[in-house]
Amino acid sequence: VQRFGAQPTDTLTLQAAPGDRLTLQFTQQNQPQTLTTNSVKLEIQMQPLSEPMLQERVVLSTHRSFESAEDSAQRWRSQGIPVEIAQPSRWQVWAKREVYNTPLLRRVLLTSLQKQGYVIPFLDSQVLKQVPQAAWIVNNTRYSNHPLQITAGKSPIQVKTGGRDPRNRSYAGQLRLQRNAYGNYTLVNQVPLETYLRGVVPHEIGQQAPQPAIEAQAILARTYALRNLRRFQIDNYQLCADTQCQVYEGLTGTYV
């Protein structure tokens, strides 16, 4: 789930298999906390801010593909401008936020580029009065600590998404709810490469494909994954689950 909290009605329900339990790990008041439960529902609350907050970045270029954005990023770096690649909707190259971390520095950069004849870079500014805050309830206690790590004892975790795009899928490995660069959250599935390929190949080629085609697709999917682990460095994960990368649906619909 790449953009949990993009809509205030977004929900996620995580369910352990019968006879299994979920373990939730997070930090509260600088102390590690562990809870166990059969299921947990994550939801979004819009959290009012005590004072308006400026969310701003210098967008140097916009692209249809990661490859095009990466080429552009290399050109900006060659001019001495630290950058990062993002995907708020389309792919973009941003001036690195850690470096251009004040309104003055961002405006100095943009003015300098305009004086050099650049017309594409622009300042993406938004004043926020509230932000999405993910929360969950276990044993009648409400929590909103992040990141949140979720594991199951021995079985896959069932994940049901609510909101505008309801789905029900099964995932091996661990799940991690973490903030992303766009002000909402990403639910990351942490699995070994072989498990990842199980969730990709049937959905890229179809479940009725002949065995030689399945084997060839597995090689292609593995090669693609290993070559593209850097795509989402800005958000602290490696690959997305849709056609911008490879379609990945966990253990749902995998080969036996």
What are these regions (language model features)?
Residues 1-256:
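Conserved, single-site charged/polar hotspot
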